[in-house]
Regions:
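Blade-level signature of beta-propeller repeat domains, shared across WD40, Kelch, NHL, RCC1
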Residues: 193-226
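Short loop/turn segments that connect beta-strands within beta-propeller blades
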Residues: 31-36, 78-85, 128-132, 174-179, ...
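Beta-rich, blade/repeat-based domains predominating
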Residues: 2-14, 45-62, 97-111, 144-157, ...
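Eukaryotic tandem repeat interaction scaffolds
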Residues: 77-79, 83-160
Length: 226
């Protein structure tokens, strides 16, 4: 158990490291086995300098890139630059996406290689990580309007799932149009109240839900989401 300089919002594990984003404008990086602190992306000072981010909300790794969604941009850092005791430089930042607090989520469609990212402005932004080049601010390759405010998303065998506010709180969504295909707010005997962050691993949906008495995490077999 550790304390951060701001409220933690996103976490991921990849290649024996744990990455935690928080509103203190940093992404903390730990050794996954010893939990020893290694370094951080962002120096804790709000800004857009070469070693800065603004409030960090989510983090994802894909093909050697660490991707961090902060309050304004998606920041890209080379994974090979992550070294203990060294603050890595931002490789490149996306175009300005609008300065908004909220819950953000990112996932890569392995079939197309596109990065999908939620935004509180009722939209899902698309990027092409394979085309990232140093010194060139990547622009969105697409944008999907969404019925509700999306919080998080993930793919499972080509199917896109999105958590959000509104009546349809957890849905399967068409990855090309953003249209809701099926509402899974009720899964078996579980009715989600206020789901937010989730991931799908080992054929299982792990999803946080804010319920009356606090927050719980469900583990639901994907076979239940037909």
């Amino acid at each position: 158990t550790g304390k951060f300089g701001g409220r933690p919002n996103g976490v991921t594990r990849a290649n024996d490291k744990i990455y935690v984003t928080h509103e203190g404008s940093r992404t903390e990086i730990f050794d996954a086995k010893s939990h020893q602190f290694l370094t951080c992306i962002g120096n804790g000072s709000w800004g857009t300098g070469p070693t800065q981010t603004v409030h960090a909300f989510d983090v994802l790794l894909y093909k050697g890139l660490v991707m961090i969604h902060d309050k304004r941009y998606v920041n890209f850092v080379e994974e090979q630059a992550i070294q203990s005791g060294v603050t890595p430089r931002i490789y490149v930042r996306s175009e300005h996406l609008g300065e908004t607090n909220g819950t953000y989520g990112m996932a890569v469609d392995e079939q197309t290689g596109l990065l999908y990212s939620t935004h509180p402005a009722k939209r899902i932004d698309l990027f092409a990580p394979d085309g990232i080049r140093e010194g060139v601010s990547p622009k969105r390759t697409g944008q999907l309007a969404y019925k509700n405010v999306p919080y998080d998303l993930d793919f499972y065998e080509g199917r896109l799932f999105v958590s959000s506010d509104g009546t349809e709180k957890f849905c399967e969504v068409n990855p090309r149009t953003g249209e809701i295909m099926k509402d899974h707010t009720t899964i078996g005997g579980i009715t989600l109240q206020a789901p937010e962050k989730f991931c799908i691993r080992r054929h299982t949906l792990f999803i946080t839900d804010r319920v009356k008495n606090g927050t719980c995490v469900y583990a639901i077999p994907m076979s239940e989401l037909k």
